[in-house]
């Protein structure tokens, strides 16, 4: 068995440090944290906002397209970086392979653009519908620009309200009429 080298000591110190840090981060909150229980303590929240509605919210497929585009172009960058580090060794065969790879990705990008996968803005949808798009006018109405185009875009909970309405923080359109009838 050989003697322990300085590199071995560095690895041992790193493992000990990581273990200590993990144990520290797991035990200190248990020791210093509060122990109170209650209904409000068990309620989930995100970024300081109490959640409203169910967790089964349908997301637009455009979010998945963003993720897929990221993966595709991230992998493209990875392959091109690997090729660029070995460009002298692979020669013309490697260059030809990379050109075919990039052309293939460009064809996929043109196809995605042609089917409308890259038109995400509400203005693009309005142009396709034949509406006149007002951008940057002094009388710009943000509510009109960001309105829902159809009920399919509006995710509702079982009560038929949007999640903010079911939490009671936003009044529905029928609420003021009901309150005026009671008076």
Swiss-Prot record:
Belongs to the complex I subunit 3 family. Keywords: Cell inner membrane, Cell membrane, Membrane, NAD, Quinone, Translocase, Transmembrane, Transmembrane helix, Transport, Ubiquinone. It holds the Pfam family Oxidored_q4. The chain crosses the membrane at residues 11-31, 63-83, 98-118. NDH-1 is composed of 14 different subunits. Subunits NuoA, H, J, K, L, M, N constitute the membrane sector of the complex. Its EC number is 7.1.1.-. It is found in: Cell inner membrane. It is a multi-pass membrane protein. This is NADH-quinone oxidoreductase subunit A. It catalyses: a quinone + NADH + 5 H(+)(in) = a quinol + NAD(+) + 4 H(+)(out). The keyword Cell membrane applies. HAMAP family: NDH1_NuoA. PANTHER family: NADH-QUINONE OXIDOREDUCTASE SUBUNIT A (PTHR11058:SF21), NADH-UBIQUINONE OXIDOREDUCTASE CHAIN 3 (PTHR11058). NDH-1 shuttles electrons from NADH, via FMN and iron-sulfur (Fe-S) centers, to quinones in the respiratory chain. The immediate electron acceptor for the enzyme in this species is believed to be ubiquinone. Couples the redox reaction to proton translocation (for every two electrons transferred, four hydrogen ions are translocated across the cytoplasmic membrane), and thus conserves the redox energy in a proton gradient. The keyword Oxidoreductase does not apply. It is an enzyme of class 7 (translocase). Residues 159-183 are annotated as: Disordered. InterPro entries: NAD(P)H_OxRDtase_bac/plastid (IPR023043), NADH_UbQ/plastoQ_OxRdtase_su3 (IPR000440), NDAH_ubi_oxred_su3_sf (IPR038430). GO terms for cellular component: NADH dehydrogenase complex; plasma membrane.
């Amino acid at each position: 068995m050989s003697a322990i080298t300085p590199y071995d000591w560095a690895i041992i110190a790193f493992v000990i440090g990581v273990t200590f840090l993990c144990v520290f981060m797991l035990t200190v909150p248990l020791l210093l944290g509060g122990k109170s229980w209650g209904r409000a303590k068990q309620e989930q929240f995100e970024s300081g906002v109490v959640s409203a509605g169910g967790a089964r919210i349908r997301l637009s497929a455009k979010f998945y397209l963003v993720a897929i585009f990221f993966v595709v172009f991230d992998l493209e960058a990875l392959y091109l970086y690997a090729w660029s580090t070995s460009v002298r060794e692979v020669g013309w065969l490697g260059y030809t392979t990379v050109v075919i790879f990039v052309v293939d990705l460009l064809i996929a990008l043109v196809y995605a653009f042609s089917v409308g996968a890259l038109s995400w803005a509400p203005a693009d949808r309005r142009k396709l519908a034949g509406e006149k798009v007002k951008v940057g006018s002094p009388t710009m109405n943000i509510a009109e620009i960001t309105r829902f185009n159809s009920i399919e875009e509006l995710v509702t909970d079982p009560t038929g309200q949007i999640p903010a309405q079911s939490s009671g923080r936003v009044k529905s359109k029928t609420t003021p009429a009901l309150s005026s009838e009671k008076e």
